[in-house]
């Protein structure tokens, strides 16, 4: 490829609204062009990288037995009604009408679509298992699109679905796909982790995320420093904590505690640890057609993890869509006083009460007395009936691993893949069934598997690039080598550059010849910005001594290559990371 023919509209400066280096570099280097909020055009350089990512993905998925299909981007809203997700998914789901007043959605995920295909065409256990996948455009109407391709509204996704006759078969395919994803991300040269995760709006009994470690990541994962335990902070667990020694011994009584509203101040007032204080957190619960209040109790030195709290509500049948902060007006309307909320008589004030599981059989506790400036001491939860307990706390770095007691540590990460065991939920709601070996009708066991193809462009750059521009991995760079001529007006340099270019092409090297009549410094700046893996300099040194300066983009390390071994050395360098 000649640079003069390459459509790569580089910019002098990155977009002013770009925060992440991946967004800055992709826009400035001419990879992407923004159409609207969270919507991007992929220009030739980006398309080359996308094609490489997609080819690796196709190869690994098909090696593991998955079959490639292409489903409609537009889906009937009635299918989403049947699954119950039309309302549950929220405003991120874009719904529209056609000219005949039929309702459709632009699909962010395709569980409904693929389940309908299975319901119509898979009739017998003899056709199972089957794993179908696609790489296609998706749309999610994000409320705050940001960070370029990391949180875009329109994006490219690899999503797959598997159908099984029983849970055992699903378990095998879940692990099979996990292996395929590990191979894909390894081929892409990424440092990643597999973590236990929440299933979110997709649902299911078990899910794992594939996350790339990067300080710009939107997610926090909790990783054990001693074993392989890793989980998204939204579902991370810990081992049982030892109880502090200074237990506040007291009979149940009410004490005046003026202006003492935080767990820390209550603990200091009673000369004990926040561990023994019941911290009450009241949230507004958003349902499909109403709003209610829920109160969550955790120990005073813990914080609420809202994803866990929302899941706990739905386990007890709340059908909650989201949680929001309850403001002072909400509390006043419910007859509650911030800072003095406790379990006694609370049921008449809120619709749901959930205690963290660490409080089971808790005694010697201090709690709000549901009266201004008063707390109750000597609270014993064993004296209450029908309390609901669940894991609802956010793990701290001072906590210990639930598997080995090792130290837990936070890492910032960016999710690039997710696999789910969906079970029979979608099959039942969409009446997708088959006949088993006994001739009885059974619902499919389903798995769901996704990789963010376009997000991977950003993930690679966030992990690998530097302040100068793009640094790609071995299998993702848009070009292997760019040949940079020191003085394009020197006919001898120009002639040698074309000769070297042809030699590299014959060896299968994806080479770019910078044939522009531009300053040498400007050409090298574009090399740093675009991120070809190597830059080969053709100048006076090459003409006079038959030696070429070669620069690795990854670390800007320089090497001198003799003309007689040029192709051999370049192939060696390209074969290494």
Swiss-Prot record:
GO terms for molecular function: aminoacyl-tRNA deacylase activity; ATP binding; proline-tRNA ligase activity. Pfam families: HGTP_anticodon (PF03129), tRNA-synt_2b (PF00587), tRNA_edit (PF04073). CDD domains: ProRS-INS, ProRS_anticodon_short, ProRS_core_prok. Catalyzes the attachment of proline to tRNA(Pro) in a two-step reaction: proline is first activated by ATP to form Pro-AMP and then transferred to the acceptor end of tRNA(Pro). As ProRS can inadvertently accommodate and process non-cognate amino acids such as alanine and cysteine, to avoid such errors it has two additional distinct editing activities against alanine. One activity is designated as 'pretransfer' editing and involves the tRNA(Pro)-independent hydrolysis of activated Ala-AMP. PANTHER family: MITOCHONDRIAL RIBOSOME PROTEIN L39/PROLYL-TRNA LIGASE FAMILY MEMBER, PROLINE--TRNA LIGASE. Consists of three domains: the N-terminal catalytic domain, the editing domain and the C-terminal anticodon-binding domain. Its EC number is 6.1.1.15. It comes from Helicobacter pylori (strain G27). Its main location: cytoplasm. Keywords: Aminoacyl-tRNA synthetase, ATP-binding, Cytoplasm, Ligase, Nucleotide-binding, Protein biosynthesis. This is Proline--tRNA ligase. One of its GO terms (cellular component) is cytosol. It catalyses: tRNA(Pro) + L-proline + ATP = L-prolyl-tRNA(Pro) + AMP + diphosphate. The lineage of its organism: Bacteria, Pseudomonadati, Campylobacterota, Epsilonproteobacteria, Campylobacterales. Homodimer. It is found in: Cytoplasm. InterPro entries: aa-tRNA-synt_IIb, aa-tRNA-synth_II, aa-tRNA-synth_II/BPL/LPL, Anticodon-bd, Anticodon-bd_dom_sf, Pro-tRNA-ligase_IIa, Pro-tRNA-synth_IIa_bac-type, Pro-tRNA-Synthase_IIa_type1. HAMAP family: Pro_tRNA_synth_type1 (MF_01569). One of its GO terms (biological process) is prolyl-tRNA aminoacylation. The keyword Aminoacyl-tRNA synthetase applies. Belongs to the class-II aminoacyl-tRNA synthetase family. ProS type 1 subfamily. SUPFAM superfamilies: Class II aaRS ABD-related, Class II aaRS and biotin synthetases, YbaK/ProRS associated domain.
